[in-house]
């Protein structure tokens, strides 16, 4: 096989079990993630390919969703590599805690390690760089509409790219000085961090610090663990919670660059391009 930026060349006699006609397997941390990424594909098509608005029924995206978080995602990805049967696109959160963070979370590390070890011809990976996780890709207007009313909406006047949109800003993340300084400087409220500073001086290690702060409320609250499900109109989740609204996710098809921050624009374009390239298919006309 030969892989370049745009074309994958496959030698049939070497990979006789490979099925290029079947749908791409899209591997994410949760099944709801790939449902959200469909909208990024439509955004990319409207903004960069056709450069016009169209109905979501004009064409289709077809894929088989897979999920795995932490170490599990590496095992699932390796399984896809070993089978050599399908195309597989894997998209992972960076889990970066601040803008200067050069590290990745466990899930992203597993994806990177597996891809570097096997360099598969049938798989492509993408790890977000400009935001912490998928919830940071949700446009502000949807967080304001569906997020927990107790969440810290003031973050939208700042940079929410690395804010934990689900839980909020917790003391547990502020042990490391660079993360603490990042949020202290951004929020501009030294009084907010007095407890953190006092407890950190009393603790010798992060393990001790984590024990002391266990159970404490976030300094700034997030918008709920169900935020993404509410935004995309996850039928199973919403039915269980009796919050199902049939047209809940229709507005996601109408996102424009003006609805997004610069960081979101870059990620929506990158992920949208991959979803468009790897999952776009002909619309059934029967």
Question: Where do the model's predicted regions map?
Answer:
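RecA-like P-loop NTPase motor core
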Residues: 1-98
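Charged/polar, solvent-exposed surface patches and flexible loops
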Residues: 39, 75, 79, 113, ...
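Generic recognition of cysteine residues
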Residues: 62, 88, 123, 170, ...
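Glycine-centered flexibility motif
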Residues: 68-71, 103, 224
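Acidic, serine/threonine- and glycine-rich low-complexity intrinsically disordered segments
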Residues: 73, 78-92, 97-130, 142
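Activity-critical C-terminal alpha-helical subdomain
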Residues: 107-227
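Charge-biased C-terminal accessory regions appended to nucleic-acid-, cytoskeletal NTPase
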Residues: 205-286
């Amino acid at each position: 096989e030969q892989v370049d930026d745009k074309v994958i060349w496959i030698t049939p006699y070497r990979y006789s079990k490979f099925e290029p006609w079947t749908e791409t397997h899209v591997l994410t941390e949760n099944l709801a993630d790939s449902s959200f990424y469909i909208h990024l594909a439509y955004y990319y098509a409207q903004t960069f390919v056709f450069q016009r608005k169209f109905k979501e029924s004009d064409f289709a995206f077809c894929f088989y969703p897979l999920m795995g978080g932490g170490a599990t995602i590496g095992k699932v990805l390796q399984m896809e590599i070993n089978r050599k049967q399908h195309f597989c696109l894997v998209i992972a959160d960076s889990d970066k805690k601040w803008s200067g963070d050069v590290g990745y979370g466990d899930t992203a590390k597993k994806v990177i390690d597996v891809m570097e070890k096997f360099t598969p011809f049938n798989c492509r990976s993408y790890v977000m760089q400009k935001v912490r996780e998928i919830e940071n890709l949700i446009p502000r207007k949807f967080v304001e509409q569906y997020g927990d009313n107790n969440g810290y909406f003031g973050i939208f006047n700042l940079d929410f790219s690395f804010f934990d949109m689900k839980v909020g800003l917790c003391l547990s993340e502020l042990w490391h000085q660079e993360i603490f300084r990042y949020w202290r400087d951004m929020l501009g409220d030294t009084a907010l961090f007095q407890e953190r500073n006092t407890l950190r001086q009393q603790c010798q290690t992060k393990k001790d610090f984590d024990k002391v702060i266990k159970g404490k409320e976030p300094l700034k609250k997030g918008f709920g663990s169900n935020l993404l499900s509410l935004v995309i109109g996850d039928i199973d989740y919403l039915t269980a919670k009796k919050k199902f609204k049939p047209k809940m996710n229709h507005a996601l098809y109408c996102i424009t660059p003006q609805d997004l921050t610069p960081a979101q624009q870059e990620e929506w374009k990158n992920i949208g391009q991959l979803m468009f390239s790897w999952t776009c298919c002909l619309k059934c006309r029967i």
